[in-house]
UniProtKB/Swiss-Prot annotation:
GO biological process: one example: post-embryonic development
Key words of the record: Acetylation, Lipid droplet, Membrane, Transmembrane, Transmembrane helix
Pfam families, per the entry: Oleosin
Main location: other
Biased composition (Polar residues): 172-181
Transmembrane segments: 49-69, 74-94, 96-116
Region named Polar: 2-51
Stated name of the protein: Oleosin S2-2
Function noted in UniProt: May have a structural role to stabilize the lipid body during desiccation of the seed by preventing coalescence of the oil. Probably interacts with both lipid and phospholipid moieties of lipid bodies. May also provide recognition signals for specific lipase anchorage in lipolysis during seedling growth.
Membrane topology value: Multi-pass membrane protein
Region: Disordered, residue numbers: 164-188
Gene assigned in the entry: S2
């Protein structure tokens, strides 16, 4: 069995005590003091190596593209500012045209997203992972029936409220005294 010696070094200017282990064989104390670990410490795993091999070129190329885009934007801005000043009467119609073009591009993207979700729904339907169309129709019918019932109930409540207000207004008109020239009426 290996033994561990501990030697104490004291620095006259330092008031703290430093322990320095001496090793015989491969035994030490604590983590990282020469003891053999139970886990494999042979280096990076194959997943990490593959991620590095794939990630560095992809990340580098994306970083280069970002730099080129930034440089192009700065150069374009430097060239376009004097043109904006010279051709300012043309800029407003151009801005409107660009705004309409951007709106058209966004609408196109929205239509594409709608089409993609429709295709996804069809594929899920064909695979059988979603509800069938009759089940969806039954669910929609139940929801519509609930909505119609709710609207009917609210209509009845509103009709009752209006009727109560009409009776209340009629009752207050009967209990008041009205005096007209030539007649005196009193209702109670």
């Amino acid at each position: 069995m290996a033994t561990v010696e501990r030697r104490v070094q004291v620095d006259p200017t330092d008031k703290r005590i430093h322990l320095q282990p001496q090793y015989e064989g491969d035994v030490g104390y604590g983590y990282g003091y020469g003891g053999r670990a139970d886990y494999k410490s042979s280096g990076p795993s194959s997943n990490q190596i593959v991620a590095l091999i794939v990630g560095v070129p992809v990340g580098g190329s994306l970083l280069a593209l970002a730099g080129l885009t930034l440089a192009g934007s700065v150069i374009g801005l430097m060239l376009s500012v004097p043109l904006f000043l010279l051709f300012s009467p043309v800029i407003v119609p151009a801005a409107i045209t660009i705004g309409l073009a951007v709106t058209a591009i966004l609408a196109s993207g929205l239509f594409g997203l709608t089409g993609l979700s429709s295709v996804s729904w069809v594929l899920n339907y064909l695979r059988g992972t979603s509800d069938t169309v009759p089940e969806q129709l039954d669910y929609a019918k139940r929801r519509m029936a609930d909505a119609v019932g709710y609207a009917g109930q609210k209509g009845k409540e509103m009709g009752q409220y209006v009727q109560d207000k009409a009776h209340e207004a009629h009752d207050t008109s009967l209990t008041t005294e009205t005096t007209e020239p030539g007649k005196t009426r009193r209702h109670t």
